[in-house]
Amino acid sequence: MTTPEQRNRTRERYAYFRATKPILMVDFWNDGCLTQGCIAGGRKYFHVNARGDVEPCVFCHFASDNVKEKSLVEALNSPLFREFRSRQPFSENLFRNCPLIDHPEQGKEIALKFARYFTHEGAEEFFTELFPAIDAYSKAYGEIAEAAWKERMKRQDDKPLPAGKKVVGKHG
């Protein structure tokens, strides 16, 4: 996992390359400005793993349903997915859009209250043994991201758009 400083540098470099090169680059962690926050939980994206478990995101290894037992419509309307979507965006600062690494307390609460099972061996360790380190990471990156977000908001031509508006121009 990148350090908070490396993550910020990645965000800056992606913005530079998008502005200067004819290339499509996508970064789940840092592209909240392009998508108005996290796209997971069925808002614009979800993941079905090889066993058929319907996960909010490829990085969220917990589920309530399996496509072998329920339809996608039923899975996407489960309490897990409804709760996930109800909390989006997880922050007004769209540089901090992930419920796992930017707001781990929210990811933990969603997983432990609304998921029926973990989808990978050891996945629960993210919310137990690894949680203190992830929480510390989130706080350290949060300081960097807050400063970057305040700077972004100062730019008159780059205000956040209401949900549903098309994003055009600089994105970083």
Residue positions per predicted region:
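Radical SAM enzyme [4Fe-4S]-AdoMet core and its adjacent flexible, acidic
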Residues: 1-41, 47-51, 55, 59-70, ...
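Short glycine- and hydrophobic/aromatic-rich loop-to-beta-strand nucleating segment
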Residues: 46-47, 103
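Flexible mid-to-C-terminal extensions adjoining Fe-S/redox cofactors in radical SAM and related proteins
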Residues: 59-172
